C-alpha cells in the first residue's frame, strides 16, 4: 500500500484517545474469544433497574433463530438518557438547536429536557397511550422530536419514527403495518427555506381506507401555518403539556422488550419494520458513540442525519444522550442558504465532532472550496462518514477542506438492521485508507463468503456476512418473523447476510463495494459499481456519478454511467470520451463505461441515498413501469433522465 494512501494516527491523538492500537487488538480479541465476559463487563456502562445475570443466548441457525442479550435484566432507555445525568449534570446543555433560519436558536439542559419529556410522557398517557402501544412520530428536526421519542420510551410505548419528507402513502403503509394508536406531528416543518406540510400529509395518510387504528393526532405548533382540524381526533401539543405534571415514573422494561420500530425499504418494495429492543441496543449505541468518536465529556457533537433514519436514532438521540453529550440538532440542510452553512455552524457552535454523509460532502465539493475561505474549523477534532461508501476523492476533500488535515475520519459501515456501527476506524487506533471502513468494532465478526457460502480467507472479495450476534442487532421484522429469517439467515446458513459485497485487503481492512445487486458482471468479471463511481468522481469535472449494469448483447452486462458535472462545466462528446479513458486508466479496460448519460440530478431519497432501481430500469430502457417514486426528494429527476436516456430500442 503506497504511503500516500495511508493516513497514520498522529502521536497526539493516539496519546489522548480512549483506545490505542494495542488496546484495540487486546479488546477485540477478548470480545471474540470470550464474548460473555466482555459484554458482562461493558453492559454495565448503562444503568439497570434489575441487573442482568444472563448475557447472551444467540444462534443464527435459520431453523432455531435466537437473539437475546442481557435478557434477564430490566431498565428504561429514557432514564439512561436523562435521569442518570441529573445529580451531577442537570445544568449541562443536552441539545443545541439551530433552525432552518439561523436566527432561530435554542439550548436545552439535561434538567430542562427531563422536565419536557416527563410532561409529554404524561400527556401521552392522558391520550390513552400504554406500555406496548405503537406511536407514529412524523416530525421536523426540532428538539420535540427527541422529546417525543424519549417520552414513548419512558412509558414503555414503542415509537415508529417516519422521516418528515415521506409521502402520505408511505406514512399510511407504516401506520397500517404498526397499527398505531397515536400519531405525533407538527403543523409544518422548515427545510431549505420551504415549509413542509406535515399535518396535511398526516391528514391525507389517515384518509387511507385501511387506516383504522389511529385515535389521536398530537400537533406541535412549529410555524403557525394554517392547518385543517379534525375535532375529537386532533389535539395541540402545547395544550396537553400545559397541564401535565413534571413528574413521570419510568416503566420498568425487560432488556428484550421493544424500544422502537423503524421501517426500511425491502427488496420487494414493501417497507419492513425493523424491531430493536431496549437493553442490547442501549449498550451498543452508547458504547459505539463513545469509542468510535472518541467522545470526551463536554464536547459538542453534531450528527447531520435526520431523526427519521437509524443514524438519527442511534447517534443523535440514544447513544449521545446516554453518554451525557451535548448534541447539535439542525432543522434544515447544511448547504442552505449557501454551501458555507456547514462551516459557519461548526464555527458558531464550536463543534468538536462532525458525523455526516458522503452525499453532502460531494454536494459541497461540486460547489467549490471557496465557500470555506472564511471557515476556521479549529474546534473540530473528529469527523465521521455514514450512509454509503465514501469515494477516496470525497474522503480527501473532506479531510483537507473541512478537517484542515488534522482530524481523523471514521468511515463507518453499518445498517438500520445492525442498530449501531459495525466496521469502522477508531481515531486513536486505526491508520486509515480513503474509502475503507477498515476494521470491525468489538464483538463484530465479519467474514467474506463466495456464492456457495464458503468462507474466503486472506485478501479477497465476496459477500459480506457476520458470523455471530452483537447486542445492537435487530430482533425481527415486525409482524413477519419469517421474512426476517428469509432475508438475513437463509442465503448463507448459520450467518447473517448483510446484502453488501466487500473486499478485504492485505492489511485485513474492509472496503464495502456496494449492495450485492450493485455488482456488474462484465464478460464474466465482477465489478463493484462503487469502484467505477469512485473513478469517475475522482475526475475534477465530475460532481457525482451513479453506475449500473444494463443488458449487453456481447458482454452480458454493459456499464451505464449517469454523470453530474461540476457547476459551469459544459457537456460535450469530447468530455464523454475523456471520462471513458479516465476510468480505463484508473481501473482498467474492463471497467470502461459503455454509455455515459449526462444527468443534472440523480433520483435520491430525502436522506440522500441514490435509488439505483430506477437507474437500472432506465438504463435497460424499461421505462413504462418504474414503480413508486413518492419517496424521492425530487421525482421530476426521473422524467428528465427518461427523456435523455441513451439505450433506446427505437
UniProtKB/Swiss-Prot annotation:
NCBIfam families: Ac_CoA_lig_AcsA, PRK00174.1. It comes from Shewanella sp. (strain ANA-3). Mg(2+) binds at residues 537, 539, 542. The gene is acsA. This is Acetyl-coenzyme A synthetase. Catalyzes the conversion of acetate into acetyl-CoA (AcCoA), an essential intermediate at the junction of anabolic and catabolic pathways. AcsA undergoes a two-step reaction. In the first half reaction, AcsA combines acetate with ATP to form acetyl-adenylate (AcAMP) intermediate. In the second half reaction, it can then transfer the acetyl group from AcAMP to the sulfhydryl group of CoA, forming the product AcCoA. Its cofactor is Mg(2+). Keywords: Acetylation, ATP-binding, Ligase, Magnesium, Metal-binding, Nucleotide-binding. InterPro entries: Ac_CoA_lig, ACAS_N, AMP-bd_C, AMP-bd_C_sf, AMP-binding_CS, AMP-dep_synth/lig_dom, ANL_N_sf. The keyword tRNA processing does not apply. Its EC number is 6.2.1.1. GO terms for cellular component: cytosol. Belongs to the ATP-dependent AMP-binding enzyme family. It catalyses: acetate + ATP + CoA = acetyl-CoA + AMP + diphosphate. SUPFAM superfamilies: Acetyl-CoA synthetase-like. It is an enzyme of class 6 (ligase).
Amino acid at each position: 500500500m503506497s504511503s500516500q494512501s495511508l493516513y497514520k494516527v498522529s502521536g497526539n491523538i493516539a496519546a489522548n484517545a480512549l483506545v490505542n492500537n494495542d488496546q484495540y487488538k487486546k479488546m477485540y480479541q477478548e470480545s471474540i474469544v470470550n464474548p460473555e465476559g466482555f459484554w458482562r463487563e461493558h453492559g454495565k456502562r448503562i444503568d439497570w433497574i434489575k441487573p442482568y445475570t444472563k448475557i447472551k443466548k444467540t444462534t443464527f441457525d435459520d431453523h432455531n433463530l435466537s437473539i437475546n442479550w442481557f435478557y434477564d435484566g430490566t431498565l428504561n432507555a429514557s432514564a439512561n438518557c436523562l435521569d442518570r445525568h441529573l445529580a451531577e449534570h442537570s445544568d449541562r446543555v443536552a441539545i443545541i438547536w439551530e433552525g432552518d433560519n439561523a436566527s432561530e436558536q435554542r439550548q436545552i439542559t439535561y434538567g430542562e429536557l427531563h422536565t419536557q419529556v416527563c410532561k409529554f410522557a404524561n400527556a401521552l398517557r392522558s391520550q390513552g397511550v400504554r406500555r406496548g402501544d405503537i406511536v407514529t412520530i412524523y416530525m421536523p428536526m426540532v428538539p420535540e422530536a427527541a422529546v417525543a421519542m424519549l417520552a414513548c420510551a419512558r412509558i414503555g410505548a414503542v415509537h415508529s419514527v417516519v422521516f418528515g419528507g415521506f409521502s402520505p402513502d408511505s406514512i399510511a403503509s407504516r401506520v397500517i403495518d404498526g397499527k398505531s394508536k397515536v400519531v405525533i406531528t407538527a403543523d409544518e416543518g422548515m427545510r431549505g427555506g420551504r415549509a413542509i406540510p406535515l399535518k396535511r400529509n398526516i391528514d391525507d395518510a389517515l384518509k387511507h381506507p385501511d387506516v383504522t387504528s389511529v385515535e389521536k393526532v398530537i400537533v406541535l405548533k412549529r410555524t403557525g401555518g394554517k392547518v385543517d382540524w379534525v375535532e375529537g381526533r386532533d389535539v395541540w401539543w402545547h395544550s396537553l403539556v400545559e397541564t401535565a405534571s413534571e413528574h413521570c415514573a419510568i416503566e420498568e422494561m425487560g432488556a428484550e422488550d421493544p424500544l422502537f420500530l423503524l421501517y426500511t425499504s425491502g427488496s420487494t418494495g414493501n417497507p419492513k419494520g425493523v424491531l430493536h429492543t431496549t437493553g442490547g441496543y442501549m449498550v451498543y449505541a452508547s458504547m459505539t458513540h463513545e469509542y468510535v468518536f472518541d467522545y470526551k465529556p463536554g464536547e459538542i457533537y453534531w450528527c447531520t442525519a435526520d431523526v427519521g433514519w437509524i443514524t438519527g436514532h442511534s447517534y443523535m438521540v440514544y447513544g449521545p444522550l446516554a453518554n451525557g453529550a451535548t448534541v447539535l440538532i439542525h432543522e434544515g440542510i447544511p448547504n442552505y442558504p449557501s454551501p458555507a452553512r456547514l462551516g459557519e455552524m461548526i464555527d458558531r457552535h464550536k463543534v468538536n465532532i462532525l458525523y455526516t454523509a458522503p452525499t453532502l460532502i460531494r454536494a459541497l465539493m461540486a460547489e467549490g472550496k471557496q465557500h470555506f475561505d472564511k471557515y476556521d474549523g479549529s474546534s473540530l477534532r473528529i469527523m465521521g462518514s455514514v450512509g454509503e461508501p465514501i469515494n477516496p476523492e470525497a474522503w480527501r476533500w473532506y479531510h483537507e477542506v473541512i478537517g484542515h488535515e488534522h482530524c481523523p475520519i471514521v468511515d463507518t459501515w453499518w445498517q438500520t438492521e445492525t442498530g449501531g456501527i459495525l466496521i469502522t476506524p477508531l481515531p486513536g487506533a486505526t491508520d486509515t485508507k480513503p474509502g475503507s471502513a477498515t476494521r470491525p468494532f468489538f464483538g463484530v465478526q465479519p467474514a467474506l463468503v463466495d456464492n456457495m457460502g464458503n468462507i474466503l480467507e486472506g485478501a479477497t472479495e465476496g459477500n459480506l456476512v457476520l458470523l455471530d450476534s452483537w447486542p445492537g442487532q435487530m430482533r425481527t421484522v415486525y409482524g413477519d418473523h419469517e421474512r426476517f429469517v428469509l432475508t438475513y439467515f437463509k442465503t448463507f446458513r448459520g450467518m447473517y447476510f448483510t446484502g453488501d459485497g466487500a473486499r478485504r485487503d492485505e492489511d485485513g481492512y474492509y472496503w464495502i463495494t456496494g449492495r450485492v445487486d450493485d455488482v456488474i458482471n462484465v464478460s464474466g468479471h465482477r465489478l463493484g459499481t462503487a469502484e467505477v463511481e469512485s473513478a469517475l468522481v475522482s475526475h475534477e469535472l465530475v460532481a457525482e456519478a451513479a453506475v449500473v449494469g444494463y443488458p449487453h448483447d456481447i458482454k452480458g452486462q454493459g456499464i451505464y454511467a449517469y454523470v453530474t458535472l461540476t457547476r459551469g462545466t459544459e457537456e460535450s462528446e469530447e468530455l464523454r470520451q475523456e471520462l471513458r479513458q479516465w476510468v480505463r486508466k484508473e481501473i482498467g479496460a474492463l471497467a470502461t463505461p459503455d454509455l455515459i448519460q449526462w444527468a443534472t440530478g440523480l433520483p435520491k431519497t430525502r436522506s440522500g441515498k441514490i435509488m439505483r432501481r430506477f437507474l437500472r430500469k432506465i438504463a435497460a430502457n424499461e421505462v413504462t413501469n418504474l414503480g413508486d417514486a413518492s419517496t424521492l426528494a425530487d421525482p421530476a429527476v426521473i422524467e428528465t433522465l427518461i427523456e435523455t436516456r441513451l439505450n433506446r430500442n427505437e
